[in-house]
């Protein structure tokens, strides 16, 4: 672990943003995902190179930092390798690989933004007509962020959590069953309802992370 774990309690959000400087997205790596048939037996490294063929290394992060970039977002699909018992337990090997990549950045004193990113189509469950299906989305979201926040609770402000990416808003109506193609979803939320649920999701995220303690 290359992060000191010491929080600067006096640092404001504006000051933190200035320290983060220019950012870069480590795209098409740990957020890569596919069907159960496509990814059966995958290791974390298999997922990481599923959409492109170059695993992230210390050299990767050193090179990024050499161009003056001081923060990196690590988009992550946490459903990869999770348990199938309905408890949404994230595989420990997957946690370890994410942490390894984080430490590549921390070795350069960089900042890391970690989120739930795409992660297949389960976000569309938030807009399903069936309330029981919507609850499944809430259960997964809470289980994921509880585990993520607990796992990384002792890192300093060099680790920043982001609730989600473009899955929020009208994407909450996505076709999570893959019953159709194209960009139109099958959810029943109105536009106003989509953004009300988005606000609710983000507040839930804050509440979950804060409740885990540590440096959160």
Predicted regions and their residues:
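Active-site-proximal beta-strand/loop segments in catalytic clefts of secreted hydrolases
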Residues: 24-29, 75-77, 115-119, 162-167
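Surface-exposed, active-site-proximal loop segments in enzymatic domains
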Residues: 36-45, 78-96, 120-137, 172-187
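Enriched - but not universal
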Residues: 27, 54, 81, 125-126, ...
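Short, well-ordered coil/turn segments that N-cap beta-strands
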Residues: 18-22, 68-70, 108-112, 153-159, ...
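Pocket-edge positions in alpha/beta enzyme catalytic cores
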Residues: 48-53, 64, 90, 133, ...
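Aromatic-lined substrate-binding rim segments of carbohydrate-active enzymes
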Residues: 56-121, 140, 198-213
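Active-site region of glycoside hydrolase catalytic domains
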Residues: 135-216
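N-terminal carbohydrate-binding accessory modules
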Residues: 1-71
